[in-house]
A protein has these predicted regions:
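ANL superfamily adenylate-forming
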Residues: 25, 108-143, 155-158, 169
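Conserved pre-ATP/AMP-binding loop-to-beta segment of ANL
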Residues: 16-18, 133-150, 157, 180-184
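A short N-terminal helical cap/helix-turn-helix that marks the beginning
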Residues: 1-20, 38
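Conserved AMP-binding A3 loop
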Residues: 30-34, 146-173
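Conserved AMP-binding/adenylate-forming core of the ANL superfamily
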Residues: 20-52, 56-65, 69-73, 90-95
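Conserved ATP-dependent adenylate/AMP-binding module captured primarily in the ANL superfamily
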Residues: 87-115, 130-132, 171-184
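A short helix-loop-beta submotif of the ANL/AMP-binding
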Residues: 57, 63-83, 87-91, 100-104, ...
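Structural detector for helix-capping/boundary residues
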Residues: 34, 50, 56, 104, ...
């Protein structure tokens, strides 16, 4: 596997099988791979309309939820670098990260207050977007950036750590080999 995009065809192929399960404290939400595919296509179309393209950065500041996963994969499909932040981060910290990274778009959860410096999008709005057509992922290589993860800043100011497709795929390859082995 060269890039994480090599996994996208599996999403289409698995259709109605369960992809994600999320408990929000009151009920369990389930997303099939078809739901995930629709979410990815919705956000890819949104990125295309906004002109957010390969090499741009997007800050993803939200609690864990299925839409987070769809938005992450949509960004990968367009070569957009994701900067995921803990949903409990302060608006001041998020604003500094938006400035440091030059993010074009900030996706935030409902409890988070939008910050200046980037266009804001509420993650809960994903399902209200129009599902885009099938798309061809933007070509990427193993040396392209997937995400910039910020350290906790325990001993100093938090720093952005770059994760490449190659780094993540190196960790995933043995796992996928085992999964494929047991499918037989």
């Amino acid at each position: 596997m060269e890039t994480l995009l090599d996994l996208l065809p599996r999403v289409e192929r698995l259709g109605s099988r369960e992809a994600l399960r999320f408990w929000n404290g009151y009920r369990t939400w389930r997303w099939s791979y078809a739901d995930l595919d629709a979410g990815i296509r919705r956000f890819v179309a949104f990125l295309d309309r906004k002109g957010v393209a390969s090499g741009d950065r997007l800050v993803l500041w939200s609690e864990n939820r299925p839409e987070w996963v769809a938005i992450f994969w949509a960004c990968l499909a367009r070569g957009v670098q994701v900067v995921p932040l803990d949903h409990q981060s302060s608006a001041d910290f998020v604003s500094r990260i938006v400035d440091q990274t030059g993010a074009r778009l900030l996706v935030h959860g409902g409890a988070a207050s939008p910050v200046s410096g980037a266009e804001c999008f509420a993650i809960e709005s994903l399902n209200g977007l129009t599902i885009g057509p099938r798309f061809r992922p933007t070509p990427v290589s193993g040396s392209d950036v997937v995400q910039i993860m910020y350290t906790s800043g325990t001993t100093a100011e938090p720093k952005g750590v770059i994760h490449l497709h190659r780094n993540i795929c190196t960790n995933l390859d043995p796992i996928l080999e085992e999964i494929d082995r047991y499918k037989k």
